[in-house]
Amino acid sequence: MKSEIEKRFRGYIFSRPFMQERVPQHVQNIIIRDYCSKHGIQYLLSATEYAMKNSTLILRQLVQNLSDIDGIVAYSMFQMPENDDERQGVFDSVLSLNKEIHFAVEGLSLYDNETYKHIENIWKLKKTLPHCASLEII
């Protein structure tokens, strides 16, 4: 008999590069499965985002269908929309439903306003760093 009911999360992976990174789908699924195992999460098969640039259709469908599960486990937080308004809209929708998004590679999760701010700060840094002067330029 289980002492506690596991939370149920749907995986979310990419079939295209994201933020100049490319990870094979089977590797993304291995990382998500391992993350779920370590965190006592029941892993539901991953949904794969369409390959078209900037597509978020599958992510939006996952968010719309969160009523039956506890949340989403994405391979990386950098698979969320790069556009600030779009990404924040996804995060706001998840939080308004009292659900969670976990990011397996970074070991982070979004479940309240504090984690929301933390994740957005990391996004700001990631987007700003390429525009900073390097030692080679100085």
Q: Which positions does each model-derived feature cover?
A:
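Short, structured surface patches at the beginning of a domain
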Residues: 1-138
